[in-house]
């Protein structure tokens, strides 16, 4: 099985998770990642940036059997921007953490826009996985 993995924050524990899993997997993984920098900016623009990259790879003949992404990607936006071949793939989203339950410095600091992005991502996915019962 060929899996397209999209990680907008490809660093730290996000990178360690994907690198570890893909290295031990029997499947073929193709990673598209963005540097681990300014997570809010990554959540805002990753779908646009990654959709362009995905389209370019399809133009070069790439195909996949499944799509895997983390909670840092707005999957609903991405699916609206990619070619139909990608929209038809079964999509799994992995919540490494989520912005609804992630501890905020103060409740007044919580930006619910990012929690809503996580919600729309979950609704757009065929399967939703969490790293713990907490998240």
Regions of interest found by a model, annotated:
Residues 15-16, 76-80, 103-104:
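Short glycine-/acidic-enriched loop or helix-start segments at secondary-structure transitions
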Residues 4, 55-77, 94, 127-129:
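Short N-terminal targeting/anchoring amphipathic segment
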Residues 25-26, 64, 88-89, 125-126:
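Short, well-ordered alpha-helix to beta-strand connector turns
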Residues 1-38, 44-64:
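N-terminal subdomain of nucleotide-sugar transferases
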Residues 82-88, 121-124:
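Short, conserved loop/helix-junction motifs that constitute active-site signature segments
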Residues 134:
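Carbohydrate-associated surface elements
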Residues 111-128:
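Membrane-proximal helix-turn-helix segments that form the acceptor-binding/catalytic region
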Residues 89, 93-116:
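Acceptor-binding helix/loop patch of EC 2.4 sugar-transfer enzymes
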